[in-house]
Structures are given as structure tokens and as C-alpha cells.
Amino acid sequence: MHLRLTLVALGAAYVCANAVESTMNRLVAETLTLLSTHQTLLIGDGNLMIPTPQHTNHQLCIEEVFQGIDTLKNQTAQGDAVKKIFRNLSLIKEYIDLQKRKCGGERWRVKQFLDYLQVFLGVINTEWTMES
């Protein structure tokens, strides 16, 4: 009985995680569409200068990207469409911040850490663009 309840709980957690991921995918897609549609409004007179990361591994530049978003938000006229863009970006940042909290983990034995390290390096090797 305990095993069955555990499996049900794991299944529910999986469904919940997939629902959140699916919602986030839709939110990102909607935000990309809004950015494309309202780019002229966001550019304004074109004189605003925002520090933009040169690094192509966007995962490493999250803080800088969101600092740029804050700068843009503070310097852009706030119509309904623009409010929606910045509300979406705020929700995306909250999601990323929640995910980052998972980085602080418990202590593991060396073998478990080395297994994690191998997966981590594999992601760097396959998903990150290497710059020289």
C-alpha cells in the first residue's frame, strides 16, 4: 500500500511539474510574440543604451539580462501591451529564481557528486556554445 501511495504521489508531482513547464513554455512564447509585435514601442526614440552581455551562453548572464529588462521597463512608456510584456518577464524571472533555489543542495558522497559533475559537464559540452 505504501508503495502504491508513493507511486501516486510521484505521478502527481510529475504531472504538476509538466503543467508548470508547459505553462512557462506558453508564457515565453507569448512574450516573444509580444516583443516582436511591440518592438517599435519598446525602442522608443532609440537613444536608450542598455548593457548587453557579449557572452552567448545566456544561462551565465541571467542577472545582467534582468537588469537590462529593469532599465528598459523604467524608461518605457507603460501602455497595456508593454505592461503585459513586463508582467510576463517578471513571471519568467520568478520561475528562474525558484529554479535557482534548487542549486543549493544537500551534501552528497563523492561518488554522487562526481555523477552529478559528469552530467553537468555533458550539458556544457552539448548545450553551451564554447567561445574562445
Swiss-Prot record:
The domain of life for this entry's organism is Eukaryota
- SUPFAM superfamilies referenced in this protein's UniProt entry, alphabetically: 4-helical cytokines
Any idea which UniProt keywords this protein has?
Cytokine, Disulfide bond, Glycoprotein, Growth factor, Secreted, Signal
Q: Which residues are glycosylated?
A: 74, 88
Q: Name one GO biological process term.
A: immune response
Signal sequence extent: 1-19
Lipoprotein among keywords: no
UniProt lists the family membership as follows: Belongs to the IL-5 family.
So what does this one do? Homodimeric cytokine expressed predominantly by T-lymphocytes and NK cells that plays an important role in the survival, differentiation, and chemotaxis of eosinophils. Also acts on activated and resting B-cells to induce immunoglobulin production, growth, and differentiation. Mechanistically, exerts its biological effects through a receptor composed of IL5RA subunit and the cytokine receptor common subunit beta/CSF2RB.
The name under which this protein is listed is Interleukin-5
Species of origin: Ovis aries
